[in-house]
């Protein structure tokens, strides 16, 4: 029943028939409108604050990005300036060398002289007249502003015609220079394309060419050489297939690239400005690319970055493939040369063995006769050597006896010298030992005195540390006591300002004294003039005089020093006897 009465249809029925329900109160639409307006204003102000915060954050982010860009630009400017100076110095040193027979250097010097002459003529015929015209126009403008003449209109028309004529001439000159620049850029691009094609041919041709080392080698076994060449062709075909895959991949990446050649050159130059170890490098160069290419979205730039990474990765893989091929080719050639040389050596050995067998049989007979003759000679030589060695042994025994006698005499003399030397050495050692013992006793005394001083210092430092710790403890106890006293005073103040009035509905609903006075109820018949209107709770005379600030000021006035700098500095530093309450302290001058 309650659910049925609370349904929307019943509520609509009650509202149409003006049948009130005790559960619902009448709605104050004006109050609701005021609340909604206040909410709208609060939400609008919050929205405005959020927008301002977003704008300030965006501006600060933009400023930080520009600051980082400036740092990178300055570093890049310094680097490019150093490179430019280095290249100019190298070019000058190259051109200044005495290369009489070098026609290329002579052509370069002539071309440099021709360019300098063209620059001088351009400055003389184009830039200097423009600067003179500009200075003349500034002078005329300044002159006409200061002095007014009747023929100003005629002169201004003439000047405008002259300026238009100069503009047309400059336009034709700039157009001619632009065409010449475009022609030179096209020539340079053609040469760069030729150089790239030549480099690609140099990269791809070595894979298809047969090495000279394998062609020049001769092998006595033709089957072995043909098998080595077929193995080399299989080896190169595998690498050629991989290289063709990389070339196709590079062509696909170049075809899918959305930027033109000039835009890609700008893109690469911007990326080269920011070093790889820079913090936030990708954010910085993407921001700079969006500034350079406002017609391109961030998605397009990221896609181009992905294509460039793929292109760079493919180039690196291609270079790795070519380096691996060169390395494997060298290894293969070394192995092939080694096998062919071994085959040639074995073939030569086989042919030499066949020849050596015949020679060996012929030499065997000659060797047998020579061996017999050699044995007879050897026996005679051995007999003669034994006789000679016996004679020499007798002579050596006689010499050894004489040498032993001399050695015994020399040893006796050496023993005497050694005894004298050790006596002197022992005396020196005793003197050194006595001197070292005296020095040791002196050092021990010094160390004992120093240790005594160190103990006294340590004891003094310990006493000083204990005194400081006691002072810190006393300060901590004093602070704790002050905190307790402060809490007690705050509690007393809270009790003083606490609400003590009891709930009195009769007094609340009755008339006040002011309303009674207005209506003439309970009015006193006589007005006592001496009666104070209000009760004042102020300081008495004794409390005012006991204030140290007043007493110090009176003393300064009596001495005539109340207007000096000393009084101005010392009076604000004097604190009252009782510090003021924190809730009564003024904060007007602290804002």
Curated annotation (Swiss-Prot):
Positions in coiled-coil regions: 166-195, 352-417, 466-498
Record-linked InterPro entries: CCDC148/CCDC112
Top-rank taxon: Eukaryota
Keywords: Coiled coil
PANTHER family: COILED-COIL DOMAIN-CONTAINING PROTEIN 148, MUTATED IN BLADDER CANCER 1
Protein name: Coiled-coil domain-containing protein 148
Gene designation per UniProt: CCDC148
């Amino acid at each position: 029943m309650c659910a049925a009465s609370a349904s929307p249809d019943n509520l609509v029925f009650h509202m149409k028939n003006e049948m009130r329900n005790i559960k619902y109160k009448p709605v104050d639409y004006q109050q609701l409108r005021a609340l909604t307006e206040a909410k709208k204003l609060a939400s609008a102000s919050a929205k405005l604050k959020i927008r301002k915060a977003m704008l300030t954050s965006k501006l600060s982010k933009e400023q930080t990005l520009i600051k980082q860009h400036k740092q990178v630009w300055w570093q890049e400017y310094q680097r490019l300036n150093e490179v430019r100076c280095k290249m100019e110095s190298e070019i000058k040193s190259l051109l200044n060398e005495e290369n009489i027979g070098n026609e290329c250097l002579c052509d370069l010097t002539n071309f440099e002289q021709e360019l300098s002459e063209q620059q001088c003529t351009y400055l003389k015929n184009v830039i200097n007249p423009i600067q003179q015209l500009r200075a003349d126009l500034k002078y005329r403008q300044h002159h006409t502003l200061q002095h007014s003449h009747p023929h100003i209109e005629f002169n201004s028309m003439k000047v405008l015609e002259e300026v238009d004529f100069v503009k047309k001439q400059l336009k034709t000159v700039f157009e001619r220079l632009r065409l010449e620049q475009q022609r030179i850029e096209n020539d340079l691009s053609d040469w760069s394309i030729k150089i790239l094609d030549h480099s690609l041919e140099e990269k791809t041709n070595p894979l298809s060419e047969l090495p000279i080392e394998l062609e020049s080698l001769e092998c006595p076994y033709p089957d072995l050489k043909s098998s080595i060449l077929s193995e080399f062709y299989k080896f190169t075909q595998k690498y050629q297939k991989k290289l063709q895959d990389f070339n196709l991949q590079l062509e696909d990446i170049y075809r899918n690239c959305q930027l033109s050649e000039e835009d890609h050159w700008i893109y690469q130059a911007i990326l080269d400005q920011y070093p790889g170890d820079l913090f936030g490098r990708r954010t910085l160069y993407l921001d700079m690319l969006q500034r350079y290419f406002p017609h391109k979205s961030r998605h397009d730039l990221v896609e181009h970055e992905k294509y460039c990474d793929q292109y760079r990765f493919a180039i690196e893989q291609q270079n790795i493939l070519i380096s691996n091929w060169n390395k494997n080719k060298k290894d293969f050639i070394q192995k092939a040369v080694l096998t062919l040389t071994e085959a040639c050596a074995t073939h030569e050995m086989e042919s030499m063995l066949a020849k050596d067998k015949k020679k060996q049989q012929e030499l065997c007979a000659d060797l047998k006769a020579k061996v017999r003759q050699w044995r007879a000679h050897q026996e005679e030589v051995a007999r003669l050597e034994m006789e000679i060695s016996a004679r020499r042994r007798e002579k050596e025994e006689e010499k050894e006896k004489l040498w032993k006698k001399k050695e015994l005499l020399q040893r006796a003399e050496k023993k005497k010298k050694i005894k004298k030397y050790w006596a002197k050495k022992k005396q020196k050692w005793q003197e050194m030992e006595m001197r070292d013992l005296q020095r040791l006793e002196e050092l021990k005394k010094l160390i004992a005195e120093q240790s005594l001083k160190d103990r006294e210092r340590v004891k003094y430092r310990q006493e000083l540390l204990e005194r400081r710790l006691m002072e810190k403890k006393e300060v901590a106890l004093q602070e704790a006591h002050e905190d307790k006293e402060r809490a007690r005073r705050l509690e007393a103040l809270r009790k003083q300002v606490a609400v003590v009035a009891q709930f009195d509905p009769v007094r609340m609903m009755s008339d006040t004294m002011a309303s009674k006075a207005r209506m003439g109820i309970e009015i006193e018949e006589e007005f006592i003039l001496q009666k104070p209107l209000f009760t004042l709770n102020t300081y008495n005379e004794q409390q005012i005089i006991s204030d140290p600030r007043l007493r110090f000021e009176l003393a300064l006035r009596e001495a005539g020093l109340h207007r000096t700098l000393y009084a101005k500095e010392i009076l604000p530093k004097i604190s009252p006897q009782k510090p003021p309450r924190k809730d009564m302290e003024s904060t007007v001058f602290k804002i």
